[in-house]
Amino acid sequence: MYAILFELDTNCLNDNYEGNTYHNSYKLVNDFMIENGFTWKQGSVYFGGANIDAVTCVLVVQKLSKKYPWFSTCVKDVRMLRIEENNDLLPAIS
């Protein structure tokens, strides 16, 4: 399983996002990622489905930055992770 995670510079978004408030940018990214086979997990972390591979992750991020130029301008960090196991630790602290 692969994941994409990123951090956006909110000051940069405030200056470069075309909408009323930069908070809407996160909704646009969320919708885009879901449309491209990812599931939102938390914050700016998206897990890919069974058909998502490393090449697809790169292509999706490129497509995202082409569709929303403010993304590539304002992203401080964007990573692809390969996840061997997805274990929920919540039961360990409940």
UniProtKB/Swiss-Prot annotation:
Organism: Riemerella anatipestifer (Moraxella anatipestifer)
Keywords from the named record: Hydrolase, Nuclease, Plasmid, Virulence
Name of protein: Endoribonuclease VapD 2
EC number of this enzyme: 3.1.-.-
Keyword Nuclease attributed: yes
GO molecular function: nuclease activity; RNA binding
Lineage top rank: taxon: Bacteria
Assembly mode: Homodimer.
Nuclease among keywords: yes
Matches recorded under InterPro entries: VapD
Similarity annotation: Belongs to the VapD ribonuclease family.
Function: Cleaves ssRNA, mostly between U:A.
